[in-house]
Amino acid sequence: WRGILAEPARCWHQALHSNRSACIEDRCVWKSSDSTLTFNEVELPELSTVDAFSGVDKHAQFRERGKTYQVNTISLTDLLAKHGAPEQIDYLSIDTEGSEFEILQHLDFDKYAFRVITCEHNFTPMREKLHELLTGHGYVRRHEDLSKFDDWYVRPS
């Protein structure tokens, strides 16, 4: 596939740059660019997240002894522009362990549209906020029983 992969957790950087042909972004996707956030990298690295979101879901106990460090940020809109993404994008997967709403709330939906979005929710209260946001931009939730922790949204033609 062709695409952009954003991953601020340092433990993944070497392998991603060595093994993926996609564009790799080491900055943390966030609601704004050029900020600095504390990132919490944990023993189960797929549960690493922006430290402010370390306690928001049922995985909080795995994040209690993480290694924290500062990361620079880039907004999703700026990330797409930096890499010359088309205005119509086939697929967006957003799995940031808690900050999904913050990121999507600040996305320029007038500039970028997606045929399919999968968005992790982990059954937190953020799930309904994401639903309101995405349906407000014309997306429809589908396949609610397909994935346990992710919602699938499509944008009808």
Question: PLM features: residue spans?
Answer:
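Phosphate/nucleotide-binding beta-alpha loop and adjacent structural elements of enzyme active sites
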Residues: 1-157
